[in-house]
Amino acid sequence: MDFKNANELLTLCEEKNLPVSEVMRIREIELGETSAEIVNEKMTRVLEIMKDAAFSPIKQPVKSMGGLIGGEARKLSLHAQEKKGLCGDLLQKAITYAMATLETNASMGLIVASPTAGSAGIVPGLMLAMQEHYHFSDEKIIQALFNASAIGYLAMRNATVAGAVGGCQAEVGVASAMAASAAVELMGGSPKECTFAASTVLMNMLGLVYDPVGGLVEYPCQNRNAAGVANAIIAAEMALAGIPQLIPLDEMIQTMFTVGKKLPAELRETAMGGCATTPSACEACHMCS
């Protein structure tokens, strides 16, 4: 069982009467010539790593290697405990876990690139927040991760997830699309609604540049992971409400790729434009001088 694009994925889902997650899981088993047990064990390990990367910085903040971030997730957690937050429980936890994961990455901790290190907080941020908020089992979250991986696979096969090629839209944008699709399936949405959510996300983040201060995956990457997880919730909610997406996911992936290639090199991970060249950023980071 294999698919090259979202249209083929939806056809398989309809023909086999399966959710996106199960089509992707079977694909991994068949193409990897392995067993269901091994594939499930690997995804179980993925979830374990995600949990540790998201929870550890909240308990014990660590400064990043570049010194630009560290402790933000704990501040968000404490703020939530004071009951003064603007966000509801789900979004508050999601942005906290997303930012925490970036702290783990920036301090040389173990993370799951989903699909990249710079966007690694979005999928676990939303999945772990939904698990706590809705009391989903690990098995349900693991299944949702297979759904997310299907969207990531489509972006990698037909476009890019590299910021150096497509800008931050290809990293944070794709990660947000993965999370949105997984969230839709978790809440009982259809395969088509999953692709609607993913397409909406990419549309909302189209053209986002990659401008890491000092060339480090710290700032503004951490903030954008928080924005990405919020974007995923918005897109998933719209899809679940029955709002269709005019532009299919396959077309949106191609559009993202086209726009990314048109971005100047200064805005594609070179730290030569955008936030990276502001006076305040350069003053804060000795690597900019």
What are these regions (language model features)?
Residues P124-H135, A180-G188:
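Alpha-helical support elements that line or immediately flank enzyme active sites
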Residues L86, A113-A120, E132, F136, ...:
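Glycine- and small hydrophobic-enriched segments that form the cores of compact globular domains
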Residues M1-G109, H133, G242, L249-S289:
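Generic N-terminal targeting/processing segments that precede catalytic cores or assembly contacts
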Residues G88-N105, K140-A159, M203-P212, A271:
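Acidic-glycine-rich active-site phosphate/pyrophosphate-binding loop
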Residues G85, S114-A117, E139, G163-E171, ...:
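Alpha-helix capping and helix-loop boundary segments enriched in small/acidic/polar residues
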Residues L145, I151-A164, C168-M178, A183:
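Glycine- and acidic-residue-rich phosphate-binding/metal-coordinating active-site segment common to enzymes
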Residues A183-S289:
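Functionally critical mobile loop/hinge segments
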Residues M108-L126, A170-A175:
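Conserved phosphate/anionic-ligand binding catalytic regions in large, soluble enzymes, centered on
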